[in-house]
A protein has these predicted regions:
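A structure-centric signal for secondary-structure junctions around beta-strands
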Residues: 8, 123, 179, 212-214, ...
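Aromatic/pi-system hotspot detector in well-structured domains
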Residues: 102, 198, 254
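Glycine-rich "substrate-gating" loop/helix at the edge of Rossmann-like oxidoreductase active sites
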Residues: 153-156, 187-199, 219-231
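Alpha-helix N-cap/helix-start motif
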Residues: 21, 95, 137, 194-198, ...
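C-terminal structured domain segments across diverse proteins
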Residues: 146-148, 159, 182, 187, ...
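Alpha-helical substrate-binding/gating segment
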Residues: 203-215, 226-254
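N-terminal Rossmann-like NAD(P)+-binding domain of SDR-like oxidoreductases, especially those catalyzing
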Residues: 1-187, 234, 240
Length: 254
């Protein structure tokens, strides 16, 4: 799978303690990669990261992507060949409660990571994960396309659009002729085992039903696509493989 490209490769994952990040750690370990992770904390109790005892199976670095010096020191210490950037403030409701934190994490955190990519010669490929909510929401019935307008009517969505813009600027300004091949990936809502986060429809339903309570749906009139967590992760891994092995121009993949 993935042409054995990850075997013995040094792979850094930001946001590795989260739902998708912990699944990505486990998959990369199974592929034979040497994995390191950088995250501010374990976001839920219980957590998929702790259930898999990943802190004992990878190089586990605790730090905030908003702290550029801490992130740079981690990158310089581990010297990764491939990077997956998943660290984020991922919740729309929290983005209303703390918009500054959301922009600092999702935009400035991405900027700090891009600076590491620019200055660490060991890195040959990087996948920067954003969101399908980076598009301007015009309430049409079909899926958004690569050439649709970026936007965001809430702080979370706008922060992801900002992350896309800064990533594109670095691609065009610094990585066209030298440096790592990088791409962004825009996934939608994910479901699957190991997700204990709040403001996620399936965990919220299970918690409410187990306590014989009604389920509080944040926006019952919304329509959103869902995919199993392993589907976008397979896309990230395929994209990372192509960026690393083929020096391809796989820019802004959704």
């Amino acid at each position: 799978m993935f042409k054995n490209i990850y075997q013995d490769k040094r792979v850094l994952i930001t946001g590795h303690t989260g739902f998708k990040g912990s699944w990505l750690c486990a998959w990369l370990l199974d592929l034979g990669a040497k994995v390191a992770g950088y995250s501010v904390d374990v976001p839920t109790k219980p957590s998929h990261f702790e259930a898999l005892a990943l802190a004992n199976r990878i190089e586990h670095f605790q730090g905030d992507v908003r702290n550029k010096d801490s992130l740079r020191q981690t990158v310089d210490r581990f010297c990764p060949e491939i990077v997956f950037h998943l660290a984020a403030q991922p919740l729309v409701r929290k983005s209303y409660e703390d918009p500054a934190l959301t922009f600092e994490t999702n935009f400035t955190g991405t900027l700090n990571l891009l600076e590491c990519l620019r200055n660490q010669p060991s890195i040959l490929a990087a996948v920067l994960v954003t969101s399908d909510k980076c598009y301007e929401n015009v309430e049409w019935l079909w899926g958004y396309r690569e050439n649709d307008r970026l936007g965001g009517k809430d702080p979370y969505s706008a922060s992801k659009a900002c992350a896309e813009l800064i990533s594109k600027a670095y691609m065009e300004s610094f990585f066209k002729e030298k440096g790592p091949n990088i791409a962004t990936a825009r996934a939608g809502n994910v479901i699957g085992g190991g997700d204990w986060a709040f403001d996620r429809i399936i965990p919220d339903c299970i918690r409410a039903w187990s306590e014989k309570k009604s389920v509080a749906i944040r926006n019952p009139n919304a329509t959103r696509p869902w995919q199993h967590v392993l589907e976008p992760l397979s896309g990230y891994l395929t994209l990372g493989q192509k960026l690393y092995s083929e020096n391809s121009v796989c820019k802004n993949q959704s």
